[in-house]
């Protein structure tokens, strides 16, 4: 059980490291996606 907890800690640390690398990119992608969705909504409302 102790070994499992150790593995979990190591896994979480590496996961956190990956998240730190990926998060800024994901945030940028999310903003771009939100903006394009908002633009689509605006276009749709104008067409109605």
Curated annotation (Swiss-Prot):
Disrupts cell membranes, particularly those rich in phosphocholine, through formation of pores. Has antimicrobial activity against Gram-negative bacterium E.coli, Gram-positive bacteria B.subtilis and S.aureus, and hemolytic activity against sheep, pig and guinea pig erythrocytes. Has insecticidal activity against S.frugiperda ovarian cells by opening non-selective ion channels. Enhances the insecticidal activity of spider venom neurotoxic peptides. Keywords: Antibiotic, Antimicrobial, Cytolysis, Hemolysis, Ion transport, Membrane, Secreted, Target cell membrane, Target membrane, Toxin, Transmembrane, Transport. Signal peptide: none annotated. Expressed by the venom gland. It is found in: Secreted; Target cell membrane. One of its GO terms (biological process) is monoatomic ion transport. GO terms for molecular function: toxin activity. Belongs to the cationic peptide 02 (oxyopinin-2) family. One of its GO terms (cellular component) is other organism cell membrane. This is M-oxotoxin-Ot1a.
């Amino acid at each position: 059980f102790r070994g499992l907890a150790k593995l979990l800690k190591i896994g979480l640390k590496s996961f956190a490291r990956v998240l730190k690398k990926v998060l800024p990119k994901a945030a940028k992608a999310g903003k771009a996606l939100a903006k394009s969705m908002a633009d689509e909504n605006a276009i749709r409302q104008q067409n109605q």
